[in-house]
């Protein structure tokens, strides 16, 4: 009998509708039947209270048509909207139009070399370019650019070192050669903030950030605190690199940073094709596959322009 009464109640209310189009019988719950007495609740969240009272009266009239019912009790309920967690405002980097991350799932894939190549090529295309070496634990940008000096400061701001029109900053400028940097995540993240926001950039079109490998504190700090325009992911053909890159892709997708493309470095030496697989699986453009070239390593060691050896189709992706 209880089931029959529940169906009768729902059926009786099916033609009572709120002005916003909500059917009354779709927002009732907690139907209780005790003998000939019934009760239920109506969720009036976001509804006009006067209209709700009018529809409640209509509901009672309709239910009184069921002869078995003696007493009707209807209560209103209202769910509180979930409070949105206040989002911390993200920083813009002064005098920088676009920020592009260059990232990888693991170390040793040539990420810093690719970062330098991207910066050098954009500079040759007459863009104003800067590069930040955010690989706190293994800074190699100073070596690639042949920089052995410490940046100057002015009015409390760091002046980046300019090499062939590219403005360069790195934690490597501030530590002794071969010294280990032993910092926990918060200290490393604070240092990245100083490299980005305390540096006095001179009207950049692009700021390229050479990220540390992995998906740690520095990555989260960057994604949560700065307005970023996209990330280029560097991989190598081996399966082990592909596995680690998938974690990076997952991070950037979850935090809604556009993945501009994948660059596969050290290509054609191995049977596997990590860059191609990832491109197809995640529908991410494969920007380039760069073969192993001894000349590239030699150019990095001698701080020679990488653009003399190869170029990337950047205009299609940035």
From Swiss-Prot:
Binding positions for ATP per the UniProt entry: 105-112
Domain of life: Bacteria
Assembly, per entry: Homodimer.
InterPro entries assigned: Mrp-like_CS, Mrp/NBP35_ATP-bd, NUBPL-like, P-loop_NTPase, YlxH/NBP35
One Gene Ontology MF term: ATP hydrolysis activity
Protein family per UniProt: Belongs to the Mrp/NBP35 ATP-binding proteins family.
Function summary: Binds and transfers iron-sulfur (Fe-S) clusters to target apoproteins. Can hydrolyze ATP.
Name of the encoding gene: mrp
Protein's recorded name: Iron-sulfur cluster carrier protein
UniProt keyword terms in alphabetical order: ATP-binding, Hydrolase, Iron, Iron-sulfur, Metal-binding, Nucleotide-binding
């Amino acid at each position: 009998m209880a089931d029959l009464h529940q169906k009768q109640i729902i059926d009786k209310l099916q033609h009572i509708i709120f002005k916003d189009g909500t059917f009354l019988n779709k927002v009732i719950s907690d139907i209780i039947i005790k003998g000939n007495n019934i009760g239920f609740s109506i969720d009036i969240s976001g509804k006009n209270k006067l209209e709700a009272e009018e529809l409640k009266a209509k509901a009672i009239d309709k239910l009184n048509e069921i002869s078995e019912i003696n007493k009707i009790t209807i209560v209103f309920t209202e769910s509180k909207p979930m409070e949105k967690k206040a989002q911390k405002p993200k920083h813009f980097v002064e005098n920088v139009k676009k920020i592009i991350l260059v990232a990888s799932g693991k170390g040793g894939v040539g990420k810093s070399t690719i970062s330098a190549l991207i910066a050098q090529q954009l500079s040759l295309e007459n863009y104003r370019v800067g590069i930040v070496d955010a690989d706190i634990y293994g800074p190699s940008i100073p070596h690639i650019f042949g920089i052995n000096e410490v940046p100057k400061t002015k009015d409390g701001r760091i002046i980046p070192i300019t090499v062939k029109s590219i403005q360069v900053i790195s934690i490597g400028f501030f530590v002794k050669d071969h010294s280990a940097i032993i910092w926990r995540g918060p200290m490393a993240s604070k240092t990245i903030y100083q490299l980005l926001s305390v540096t006095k950039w001179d009207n950049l079109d692009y700021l390229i950030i050479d990220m540390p490998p992995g998906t740690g504190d520095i990555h989260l700090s960057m994604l949560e605190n700065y307005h970023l325009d996209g990330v280029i992911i560097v991989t190598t053909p081996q399966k082990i690199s592909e596995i680690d890159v998938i974690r990076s892709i997952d991070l950037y997708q979850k935090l809604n940073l556009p993945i501009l493309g994948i660059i596969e470095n050290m290509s054609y030496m191995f049977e596997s094709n990590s860059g191609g697989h990832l491109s197809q699986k995640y529908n991410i453009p494969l920007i380039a596959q760069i073969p192993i070239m001894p000349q590239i390593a030699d150019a990095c060691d001698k701080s020679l322009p990488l653009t003399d050896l190869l170029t990337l189709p950047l205009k299609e992706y940035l």
